[in-house]
Amino acid sequence: APGNKAECEREKGYCGFLKCSFPFVVSGKCSRFFFCCKNIW
């Protein structure tokens, strides 16, 4: 799972504050309060 913003974006994800919006799910971490969100489709 991604552990920072660069890794998250490389995996075509984005950093969401505390949660992710559908259809994205938490799939890692960007920083303390930001989670890496990835599309489930």
UniProtKB/Swiss-Prot annotation:
Record InterPro entries: Defensin_beta-like
Protein keywords: Antibiotic, Antimicrobial, Defensin, Disulfide bond, Fungicide, Secreted
One of the GO biological process terms: defense response to bacterium
Gene Ontology CC entries for this record: extracellular region
Database matches in Pfam families: Defensin_beta
Main localization (coarse): secreted
Cited SUPFAM superfamilies: Defensin-like
Top-level division of the source organism's lineage: Eukaryota
Subcellular location: Secreted
Family according to the record: Belongs to the beta-defensin family.
Task of the protein: Has antibacterial activity against the Gram-positive bacterium S.aureus 1056 MRSA (MIC=1.25 ug/ml) and the Gram-negative bacterium E.coli O157:H7 (MIC=0.96 ug/ml). Has antifungal activity against the yeast C.albicans 3153A (MIC=6.20 ug/ml).
Name of the protein described by the UniProt record: Ostricacin-2
Highest classification ranks of the organism: Eukaryota, Metazoa, Chordata, Craniata, Vertebrata
